[in-house]
Amino acid sequence: GPWQALTASGGHYSSLAGDSDDVFCLLLKMERCAAVSLQMNYLDRSGRREVLINTDKHTYRLDLMKKEYKRDQEPDTLFSIERDETYRTQHTDMLKNHGKLCCSLPEGLDVLRMIDAAEKSAKAESWQKNQALR
């Protein structure tokens, strides 16, 4: 379900050129999940791209750099994916399939509201509620 509230910390902390954010951490309260942690870090020299999901029944780990998927203590499952394949697939879908695999306009606007709330939270050092739910 939709995010309920979030708090964030982040910004431009490096000597990298430009003024875009290079580190951001979010803690979100979701409709059906009390705590979601999301981190973006362009300073990580090891180039990690990971998804870790803990539920009351399982732990799932997806490592996009090592091309490994793991559930609980099961052996790793290897998969094949080119580095930029997800981006190419997204653009191909937009051009050939009218974006049927992409998010809807309302979903995209919700992501933009979340980004705006994260920026406000980092600046104010406070929790932000999802205004769309009021």
PLM regions: where:
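Rossmann-like dinucleotide-binding domain that binds NAD(P)(H)
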Residues: 1-35, 40-46, 106, 110-113
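Active-site loop of classical SDR/Rossmann-like NAD(P)-dependent oxidoreductases
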Residues: 78-92, 103
